[in-house]
Amino acid sequence: MRRSILWLVVCLMLGSCALAAQSSSPTSPVPEQQSAATQRTPPAPQTPPPAPASSPPQLQTIPGTQAPAQLPTTGTLQRLTVQDAEALALKNNPQISVYRLLALASQQVTRQQKAAYYPDLYGSLTAVKPEEGSRIAAGNLNNPIVYERAAGGLALSQLITDFGRTNNLVATAALHAKAANMNSVATADQIKLAVDQAFYNALQTVALLKVAEQTVSARQLVSDQITTLFQNKLRSQLDVSFANANLAQARLLLLDAQSNQQAALSLLSEILGYASQQPFDLVESAEELKPPPDSVSRLVDEALSNRPEIAAQTYEYQAAQRFQKAERDLLFPSVEALGVVGRTPYSNTVAGVTPFTSWYGAVGANVNIPIFNGFLYPARSREAALRAQADEEQLRDLKDRIANDVRASWLNAITAFNRIGVTQQFVDQTNLAVDLSQTRYSLGLSSIVELSQAQLQQTEAAIQFAAAKYQYQIAESVLRFQIASSSPSGP
């Protein structure tokens, strides 16, 4: 009897060892004759053991994958705050130079119009050898006789008055120059806004990259644990498939995050005026985020007073008014003084008489009175008046659009600020849901589907929370731009 019992114990021990050796092999297939209840129903609740050191993680390498995309960079790593980025862009961005040069060019137009205030002095050298008896028979009404001569002299003309036309043309050019200068200021504000958006987008991609890396790490751990449980016949192939699918999804998220970070840094480098991507160490501001103002009406009034686009369009409207007056003044006479002086060192005699003296000079005045030119001047004046009215309507439309943009930006800023707190609650609740789902799954009270759903929500919450802070800073920058505020800490 004792011998039979001892033999039975030895057989059981040998069978257990063989079964354990077979189950420890990572390539051992699932027995096909295993019942469905055994495959779907987990055994008694127990704590999942850690993955053995000898067991390689599942999906550690995926065939056909490559290293993350990395754009080539030039230069050394430099720390960069948003204020430093704005200063670099204002210094290096070619759009700043373009509008600054256009403003300088507009100032030269003013000098061109002012030239009418000054005398027009020019010199002439003339030498004539006509055919004998030649007369100018065709062309203008002038003296047809052509004398043989060689002479040189100076001619001077000076505008006395054109009854305001020149003054209005000079004022028109000066107002255009002021409008060009305001356009240069508006361009600088737009570049600063683009810098802020690119800077905070780059910071957001860095935060999302960290979220993606943490997600991959967490799901890798879950995949390893479930794979180990499956190898020990404690979980089914379905559990392993769900875990590995979640891991692959996290890796896709990581690839997108890596690509987006490189693209964001490339865009930031381009806005800062670099031809190639630069390596930046972006530094966040330590200032606490402040909520937007409570009243939007004050912001609208501030925008209508400060926006350089409104100032530029106002100058354009005023310039159109002055130009209309200048076109109207074409109907008035113009008075100018004339003077000539010169010397004739050589001239031929005609019938024994010298037709020229050795020196000559004269002064006089000329009055030009427009009488009729086919209604050209009235049409030009009417055209200028209509264009001035169009500029006035454009100014009114611009003010309406800016007021609407301020209201929309204010609403976006409030929404973005409120999203920070809501996404924090979202993160807290999803973290709790993942902990509870993990516990229920470990105890065998739920399926892998519940745990996978909780992990997906946790990842979504982490992404939303990482983006909420930077999206508010972008919305804050847009609001500052809309009201033309130079405060870096908020409106």
Language model features with spans:
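Sec/SRP-type N-terminal targeting helices
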Residues: S97-L101, K114-A115, V146, I160-A188, ...
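Acidic, low-complexity, intrinsically disordered peripheral segments
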Residues: R2-M13, L19-Q46, E131, L443, ...
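Bacterial Sec-pathway N-terminal export signals of envelope proteins
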Residues: A21-T126, E132, L159, S276, ...
